[in-house]
Design a protein with these regions (language model features):
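Anion-binding and metal-coordination hotspots
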Residues: 1-371
């Protein structure tokens, strides 16, 4: 369906808007258990279970992308759903979308458990957009949740402009409210590879963190302890530490571009565009999971996105020049082909129940066209 929108000239493809939204899981909070309370029972049968696992093949489900790690609370009804506490705790999934700005076609979408950090999904959406449209985006627009160091550098390496607020700036504003000097008050000297603090003291390079690709800069503890403005700088007994990324120059360039007037216009436009996309999705029940399990929620999101793209195609595309009966037949054939190919990929063609549920769902959603 995305490719049909591309062929109809409804997708520009060079600029995409990214955001996420929560989807209520089809499970009650009463189904949630505390895994710590089961630790005693699990330890009793651990040896027997370990013996069984050694006999099993190691590659039982190597294609599963999201693995529940150290999750304390799990729903017995829908283990893939996660508790998200935004206002009040709820079992949720999370839907991530990339939307093209020309006609608001959804070019890429992904469903994850609700506790997945949405910043981790930006680059996969960018790559899916390229795969689905055949067009490489040169600009990605998102909110501050996506403005991480990893995303800025990933966009830099791909030659993509990142129009999104820097997450560190949001943190700096919170620090300023505590009457603590932000990192911007510390001047970096490239020749000596040192920082100068607001009191005029030098912060020299200390430890190197290879995993974070950053280096710590700090003055001696004696210098910090004797500083007259220490209370405005830090409350740490060891003194103030500044972290500098090994690719700080590239990061500074990306951050500077994200503050441009063009970027600010795109960020403002993104808010309304993505709200419209998800608001239209509520007409087709995207905000409530009809089935349980991550792969089923993913299918639901594919279908809802397909219906929304069909609406765009009917409103602006070449289908408007076709008679209603021919138009409906073309859409049904296209949707049937797409769903069957997806079912083949998921190895679900043997399940007649799944096929019938999917076809009834999509045709019911398309019934408004015939009316």
């Amino acid at each position: 369906m995305v490719w049909q929108c591309v062929e109809a000239g409804l997708v520009d493809g060079r600029k995409i808007f990214v955001d996420s939204s929560l989807v209520d899981a089809d499970a009650s909070n009463n189904s949630v258990i505390d895994t710590r309370s089961l630790r005693v029972q699990l330890q009793e049968g651990y040896k027997k279970l370990e013996a069984r696992l050694e006999e099993k093949s190691e590659s039982t489900d190597s294609t599963r992308r999201y693995v529940k790690e150290n999750r304390r609370y799990i729903s017995t009804t829908d283990p893939d759903a996660a508790i998200v506490n935004r206002g009040r705790p709820k079992l949720s999934y999370q839907v991530h979308r990339a939307v093209d700005g020309r006609s608001e076609v959804i070019t890429a979408t992904e469903a994850t458990p609700g506790d997945i950090n949405e910043a981790h999904e930006m680059i996969p959406l960018l790559e899916s957009h390229h795969l689905n449209t055949g067009i490489k985006a040169n600009t990605v627009v998102a909110d501050s949740k996506y403005g991480t160091v990893e995303n800025f550098l990933a966009c830099h390496d791909r030659g993509v402009e990142a129009h999104m607020p820097d997450l560190q700036e949001s943190t700096a504003k919170r620090i300023e409210k505590l009457n603590i000097f932000p990192e911007e008050r510390f001047e970096y000297d490239g020749e000596s590879d040192t920082y100068r603090c607001p009191a005029g003291n030098r912060l020299k390079p200390r430890s190197l963190h290879k995993s974070r690709q950053s280096r710590d800069y700090a003055a001696s503890q004696k210098v910090c302890a004797a500083c007259q403005i220490r209370k405005q700088c830090t409350r740490n007994k060891s003194g103030r530490t500044i972290k500098r990324h090994l690719r700080e120059e590239e990061l500074d360039g990306m951050r500077e571009a994200s503050r441009s007037a063009k970027a600010k216009r795109d960020i403002k436009m993104r808010q309304h565009l993505m709200e419209r996309s998800y608001a239209r999705g509520t007409w087709y029940g995207f905000d409530r999971a009809r089935w349980r399990g991550l792969w089923r929620v993913q299918i639901q999101e594919y279908l809802v996105s397909a219906v929304q793209n069909i609406q765009v195609l009917l409103r602006y595309g070449s289908y408007l020049k076709t008679s209603p009966s021919v138009m409906m037949e073309q859409i049904k054939r296209a949707m049937t082909r797409d769903i069957r190919s997806f079912l083949d990929y998921a190895e679900l063609m043997s399940s007649k129940i799944v096929q019938s549920v999917l076809f009834r769902f999509i045709y019911r959603r398309l019934s408004f066209i015939e009316g």
